[in-house]
């Protein structure tokens, strides 16, 4: 380990010892190109996020995370009208709260089988630490949760809720142990921690194999062209919501199919099913939509179409929303982050212009799915990638952002198809501890400070292309701006709220994320 890494680690450890102990990261370093730091949670300690508290007139609260080891570090700063003599800013960020856009739904992650498997492997104390870290008032305050309908790649095997061939009446429908022992206990703890303030949405990876032309959930292929199959699959959705309701779990929404474009690949390595925009439209308007609307339990569910990369927009949305029958049953578009490097964000703007009454919502993202598969412990670049994508999405009308697995093991699994990836929390069940990756703190800069119901406002950046930002107004007069700097040098930055006259100057250290919160002047 290089000398400067040792020095920084010693400083971090010293800060941990003398600071507000419950709020400080318990650091562990890994070898890497830079300082790779995770925060360790064990039976005796898990870090928390210091509350915002009261915001005095003329002051701002700033939270910082950085390559050098800050993890949502709280600071209080005074408003600054003038610079010192010979002082000039590198970047100016201007917020105009009079120009408003979409409301924020929220942020969260997925209750996969794999996440549940890791969760239940830990002691009750550590389980509570994970729930507190994600859903608690001193944690990220997640308010969104995704639940796979039956199995996906982050399961230990293929299964559906009814694998009895041609059981069109679904007499054999039943929740297996994966739901009863892995997903549901985790979800119920999150519901309790949030006092019910969590919106769950469900997504299937495939219909039961016997409903597909291939006879198997794994690999591509569409549903059998049989009205009995279409109706049985619509009934299958309802039975899922009914079964979870019997465990006191209700849902806010659903997507019709996870990544339907992958279903065109007959050799796809895990569960999927093919739809085109046209076949999704027809299944929705003829079968699924009517089934959901005719039942009180499901009549208000938010139905999202696509659930795939934004490169399929706006065409996919146009096909479904321009149909006068299908559009009655569809509320929004679900998008994944995969392929965003090759699909411009302006596609989101076009979709919003075409369909201003429908929302756009981010339903899946993860690091480690290409290049280096699986976790890279303490990797800051992946935290930057998360922050960069969330800022871009929010600035292009997306209403929220859902991470993939809430936690995984040290290999990035378990995953029956060996499609291992990274996660904000990595579990070491042998040592009975878990590690918060930099991605965890990057997510917190948004989920904790951009609450449900806040509204995105106009943000302009001048001075450096390595800086990006997004801003919201919050009920009660607060404003918040999240700033990502990917610059390798420090940048003196002024934030100006043109509607209130508020101005603050802060230094952005190299490779850092900041959330700045202030109050509207009376």
UniProtKB/Swiss-Prot annotation:
Report the EC number(s), separated by commas if there are several: 3.2.1.45
Q: Origin, by domain of life?
A: Eukaryota
Q: Which residues form the signal peptide?
A: 1-21
Q: Name one GO molecular function term.
A: glucosylceramidase activity
Name the keywords, alphabetized: Hydrolase, Lipid metabolism, Signal, Sphingolipid metabolism
The UniProt entry, under InterPro entries, shows: GH30_C (IPR033452), Glyco_hydro_30 (IPR001139), Glyco_hydro_30_TIM-barrel (IPR033453), Glycoside_hydrolase_SF (IPR017853)
Which residues are responsible for catalysis? 259 (proton donor), 364 (nucleophile)
Reactions that this protein is recorded to catalyse: a beta-D-glucosylceramide + H2O = an N-acyl-sphingoid base + D-glucose; a beta-D-glucosyl-(1<->1')-N-acylsphing-4-enine + H2O = an N-acylsphing-4-enine + D-glucose; an N-acyl-1-beta-D-glucosyl-15-methylhexadecasphing-4-enine + H2O = an N-acyl-15-methylhexadecasphing-4-enine + D-glucose
Q: Which GO terms describe its cellular component?
A: membrane
Q: Does the keyword Transferase apply?
A: no
Biological process terms from the Gene Ontology for this record are: glucosylceramide catabolic process
Q: Where are the transmembrane segments?
A: none
Q: In which pathway does it act?
A: Lipid metabolism; sphingolipid metabolism
Xref: PANTHER family: GLUCOSYLCERAMIDASE, LYSOSOMAL ACID GLUCOSYLCERAMIDASE
Could you tell me what this protein does? Answer: Glucosylceramidase that catalyzes the hydrolysis of glucosylceramides into free ceramides and glucose. C.elegans contain specific sphingoid bases, which are unique or different in structure compared to the sphingoid bases found in other animals. Two examples of these distinctive compounds are: 15-methylhexadecasphinganine and 15-methylhexadecasphing-4-enine.
What does the sequence similarity comment in the record state about its family?
Belongs to the glycosyl hydrolase 30 family.
Q: What name does UniProt use for this protein? A: Putative glucosylceramidase 3
Organism, per UniProt?
Caenorhabditis elegans
